[in-house]
């Protein structure tokens, strides 16, 4: 039987925010990613580097938006807006640094297996373990691609954001 207090506790730490990214900006980033940006098959990372088990752990393409690149500042502004909303509820949450921004693109049959995001140095982190994960949803015109966090499925809308702690209590996946 599910413990109601546990569900409430989890929900307290998972922030879902609508309309963080405008529809127009979502479309521009998606168009740029489809037609200009070089996405490549994602590789699953561990604390020791790339995993030999990547194909069973993840099937998607990804690419990084780095400072100075087109749309980087737009993405950063939206990220900071989502973070600010999260911090309004969680006053002790402080974000001093962040990595560049990764775009994940799932095609038919794509997935990311259940995992947590607290891997030191896996994606350019140079200041310790990540404290928060923030996801910006750029589209919702697809079937499947269900986002699951802490064993609960979230319905996400284009332009929305989800923010949650990057620790063992919040494993997540895309199915």
Language-model segments: residues:
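Fe(II)/2-oxoglutarate oxygenase catalytic core
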Residues: 1-161, 169-175
